[in-house]
């Protein structure tokens, strides 16, 4: 616990000394209007079905990080058996079920075309939550060991989609000497390093604050405001239902978040703070990003970000794009007006078209 307290103290020191500002959360909550309470979500007939029973072709917990603070277990699922291999790398506090829309769209609906690999990072879900210093570089090494285990080692064979902290981990795959197997990199709502933009830093402090005891409804409300646009939150539930749709997209999100937070051992303070340490201290310089782009090929990289992102401010997406070489250098730009932090939810069907299109384009390139 001393290590956790030290990490928490370092993160608080890293953040600017600002009086916490609730204005953004207040505005979002006013705009989206009344949504279901925690009790109402739990009693909704769709709640037991919010995590779909998507049966994987393969599911294991494997040892990683021997000699790197481990070994400890990483849990993964492989869905589909198609020739196009996609690994989905989740962000801070998210677990593999958060990818279920993409797991269904790629690994089940088109299982003959795609093989979809999802997993829980160290510190979350069904993976172990060791108490040690996490870094995005070490978490990328976990990913490399997972790719080796499933045999995804051929040249230019793996399509990488990393969101938020997952995008930071994806940046480190090149440093982990895995660039030869990467077909292309998709950086979703992420940053090469955190610059002190007010909205982001306030919200990171907010995420730390979420770990201290308080009403679950208040926690969910704050995550909504951090990660999603008001326009999307207040729309009628767009996700396919088993029994009955939730009233709004925001209620659907709340149900998924509640299943994670109420599952014993899945979402812990220790694991969250260890991941937060890794994300908060991730740093890629402009020179390092140039090396990354040189190694992978700029035409094999996409940067996707929403202008309404209040978790990792849009300035980070613009910075990442520019320092990788920009559109003029061959990097694909996919910026979306008003979108929040979680493109796989807010623009699910467009997101699928974008990722499928990038896969098709890069497969035509010479290795």
What are these regions (language model features)?
Residues 310-316:
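Conserved alpha/beta-hydrolase "acid-adjacent" motif
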Residues 318, 324-367:
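Catalytic active-site module of serine/aspartate enzymes centered on a nucleophile-bearing elbow/loop
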Residues 221-293, 297-300:
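Alpha/beta-hydrolase
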Residues 38-132:
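Conserved HGGG/HGGXW glycine-rich cap/lid loop of the alpha/beta-hydrolase fold
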